[in-house]
């Protein structure tokens, strides 16, 4: 089973790299940042959905977006620190539905930025000098895609790829190591 997941991760990496290469980032540091942070977003999104469903099997995307604010707060309490906490408007599927908005890349960046802010106390890493390193760069697309005419295209391609790939419950329950697979594959490339 892990071989299937390994191939799924590698295919997603290849598809994302193709997007970034087409945007002029082949082999650059910006490609690495976009790739790892896109992948992190995918992981956190699917892990959150997995944890929500572990609380109650009825907690699928369609039900989560309809939940009252109070019920959603209770769900977040139940999930605790098992994963980063996301709001329904931050789910990949929600962003996927917004991809035709003007300046979608800004919607994408704002979403990742808010996830980083909301989870900063628990999920940021600190340097020796006690500087917090956030989950996501504040201007991930803007700072890495110099050609402003390509920013929406890149953000849309990312969200389409992330929405297409589904990491199911089995991948989380078996403890598949996403990031070792990701980084080993990137090093070989």
Question: Which sequence ranges carry the predicted segments?
Answer:
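Non-catalytic, mostly N-terminal accessory regions of nucleic-acid modification and defense proteins
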Residues: 1-189
């Amino acid at each position: 089973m892990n071989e299937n997941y390994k191939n799924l991760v590698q295919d997603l990496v290849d598809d994302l790299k193709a997007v970034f290469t087409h945007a002029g980032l082949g082999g650059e540091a910006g490609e690495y940042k976009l790739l790892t942070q896109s992948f992190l977003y995918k992981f956190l999104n699917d892990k959150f959905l997995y944890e929500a469903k572990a609380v109650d099997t009825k907690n699928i995307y369609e039900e989560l977006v309809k939940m009252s604010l109070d019920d959603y707060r209770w769900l977040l309490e139940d999930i605790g620190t098992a994963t980063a906490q996301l709001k329904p408007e931050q789910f990949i599927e929600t962003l996927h539905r917004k991809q035709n908005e003007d300046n979608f890349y800004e919607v994408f960046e704002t979403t990742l930025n808010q996830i980083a802010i909301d989870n900063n106390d628990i999920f940021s890493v600190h340097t020796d000098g006690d500087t917090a390193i956030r989950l996501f760069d504040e201007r991930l697309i803007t700072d890495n895609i110099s050609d402003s005419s390509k920013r929406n295209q890149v953000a849309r391609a990312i969200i389409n790829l992330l929405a297409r790939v589904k990491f199911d419950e089995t991948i989380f329950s078996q403890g598949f190591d996403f990031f070792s697979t990701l980084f080993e594959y990137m090093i070989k490339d």
